[in-house]
Amino acid sequence: MQILVLLLSYLFGSIPIGLLIARLYNIDITKVGSGNIGATNIQRNLGWGPALVVLAFDIFKGGIVLYLAKMLGMSDFYLAACALAAVLGHNYSIFLKFKGGKGVATSIGTLLVMNPLIGLGTVVIAVGIMYLTRFVSAGSMMGGIAAVLLLLYHGDPLWQVVTATGLALLILWTHRDNFQRLQAGTERRLGSPKEAKK
């Protein structure tokens, strides 16, 4: 039973909603802008409306997977595994030859269900950094780190800390190119008219 739920978590996380939404506009989102299927690239190429749909669904993917796992009474180990499986599915989708997004929105979904207060705090910190710096990547990476620190400070259960740590590491890994561009001063800011590879 647990293995089946784990597999379904990965498969649901693998649904490339950004690709599907872009196809409604006759656009292959993997071939425009950064090539990423996430909300940021959708916003830059299709506008805020489609981007918000993609953002909402990607958050939903992470949240519903963990919610159902909790409702099924799964152990802490499998709760953490299902949350991470959903994000891994988004990042390495079986429907996209194991390519995908960067997992930020899906991670937010899992955090909001796992610990709503910490999840909201993480969103506030991430959005705040994005607003101040206009770097989506900086807000994403710092948000991932902040989630771990907030859980540790709040003294929350170990499985939540382990899950958040795994999510943060995945976010840092998928943003490694962004980090290098931040260091080099070539990262694109939110709202910048000039396209840059993301």
Question: Which residues does each predicted region cover?
Answer:
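C-terminal ends of transmembrane helices
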Residues: G18, R23, G89-K99, A126-T133, ...
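Short, non-helical or kinked segments that cap or interrupt transmembrane helices
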Residues: D28-G38, F95-I108, F135-G143
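Alpha-helical transmembrane segments of multi-pass membrane proteins
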Residues: S9-S14, F57, A86-H90, A126-M130, ...
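Loop-to-transmembrane alpha-helix initiation sites
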Residues: V136-G143, D156-L167
